[in-house]
Amino acid sequence: HGAAFAAARVPVAWQVPPRSSQEPVLVLNGNQALGLGVLASGMEMVAMYPITPATSVSHYLARAFQTVGGYMHQAEDEIAAIGFAIGASYAGKTACTITSGPGLALKTEFLGYAVMAEIPLVVINVQRGGPSTGLPTKVEQGDLLAALYGQPGDTPKVVLAPATIEECFHFVILARKL
């Protein structure tokens, strides 16, 4: 009865017009787009340790790889995850590891090793809102600086920073080709 009461007394502020097209629309969040990008890129192996907010990518890929082929490895920690991905890449598989800010910090030594040994690797960092582990006061993009400069020495690498969910999909494919 509350809805009828409100409808009779509260003016409508705005209306959402119906869609003009009846074509199907794919509605995704960023992690789902990343997972689809991993599949579309032909990535054969993903290694990761569960970490918020990246974990749902591994859940999606574990199911998808059973259907399309591929291997999803849940490592015992972040360092083991990148080590596993580097080993798979060294053995000739297309591999990536997925993490978030604190995990990226733990992967830095192995990431520097992969760069210096010229072992191809895609690292997907699902950035948390920050500072810290939440959104208490503001947001920042500190993981970008960590991705660019977090390794010791001169470790040149390509860092792609998607601004949209669509770019989350396309940038995984692009990263696989670089």
Residue ranges and their predicted role:
Residues 1-31:
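Aromatic-enriched
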Residues 24-54, 59:
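Glycine-rich phosphate/diphosphate-binding loop of Rossmann-like nucleotide-binding domains
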